[in-house]
Amino acid sequence: FGKDYAGGARRTAFAIAGEVEDVPLEAMIEREPVTIVCSKMGWIRAMSGHLMLEKALKYKDGDDAQFVFHAETTDKLIVFGTNGRFYTLVADNLPGGRGMGEPLRLMIDLPNDVGIVDLFTYDPKGKRLVASMAGDGFIVPEAEIVAQTRTGRQVLNVKGDIKALLAHRVIGDHVACVGENRKVLVFALNELPEM
């Protein structure tokens, strides 16, 4: 063989490799509507299609609905625990609608003594108002709460009997709070610190 023989000449050239385009993981998942169902005992499932949210669903004995909302298989789901941690799930990885689903604690490292405060779809441009029972609160962009591991991301520091209370989507420009003394406090959203 050699360059002088038929078929012997080099057919490729040496060159610097071109840029490889990053393909997001979501591009490999088929986009389909699902209804996310999470019970009070922490059993989660994704039923295909957007079902009516008022529809009666079956649960284990002594269990009932806690979170039922529409999403898509490409969506990331955020779980907020009473320990102040945010956990991330992919809707495509959830068990189907047949049966009762699977325990959420098998998918994320949520301790047994920690409850679920909120479960919602991730919005990269959204913001959340996070607060604890002690009255501490601040605004956090949703881009800052996505966890890359099963252990979640600590956002709100809580100790002892103090637990995380809420993680509401920020809408509007004012916040209204009702205390245990049944008094209402309304203040501007820009008075809250932002993470």
Where does each model-flagged region fall?
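Short, structured "edge-of-domain" segments at secondary-structure transitions
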Residues: F1-M195
